[in-house]
Amino acid sequence: MDDKHDVVIPLGIKSYDNNFEIKVAVASIKKYFKCLNRIIIVTQIQPIKELGDDIVWIYQDDIYKHDKDANIIEKVRVAIEKVPDLTEDFIMWSDDQFITKDTEWSDTRPRYMKIYNESTLPWFLGMAKARIWYKRLLKCFARFRNNGFGCRFFNPHIPSPFNKNKFMKMCESVPYRIETGITIYSLYYNFIGEKGVPNFDEFHCTSGELNWGGCRWVGFYNSSMRKPEFVEKLKKMFDIK
């Protein structure tokens, strides 16, 4: 049995079907995250009673308009500052992520999708032409040595372990409050020199897929919430009314 660790969830205001996503995330954590200490939700919405009395709620607005992830970083920072006994190592979770089996801290190794170098540059450039998020990622890489070559693109759709002291050092070193090109996972892990492991044991639902290949970690796009069969499967898995 691993030591107990806190879970920090930066939560936005957009939700489908009466906060169904956060209900799924919290239910999966309570059911399967065996090293759970506390769940801490940082958000500007009112506490959701159905999640239980054991949730720690911290109020924080989304105050930045220039970059979405700047608000996520700020919420994690606020959790560190306002919860003095936050566990040294904690896991950051999103409401569009859940787990499907018993999980210990040793199962939470950071996963990367690709290493940014000369051979992968065409792929990254192609993705940046198609999606704004990848433009932000390339700008994130550019902060590091050698124009970012050697940086790893860490999976942004999987709960990931953070160290609160290292995270605060990143906050103090990177002007995320005013600069663009902020992608929290790749920024943090490349800042601390984390090598991670190639992505595995994870499935991302783009359109409500029901077969997750036995993966432990499952994330989903909002479009999956429009698939009744996907929603019903989650309700049954986690006994959500």
What do the predicted segments below correspond to?
Residues Q44, S94-Q97:
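Short acidic donor-binding/metal-coordinating loop in glycosyltransferase active sites
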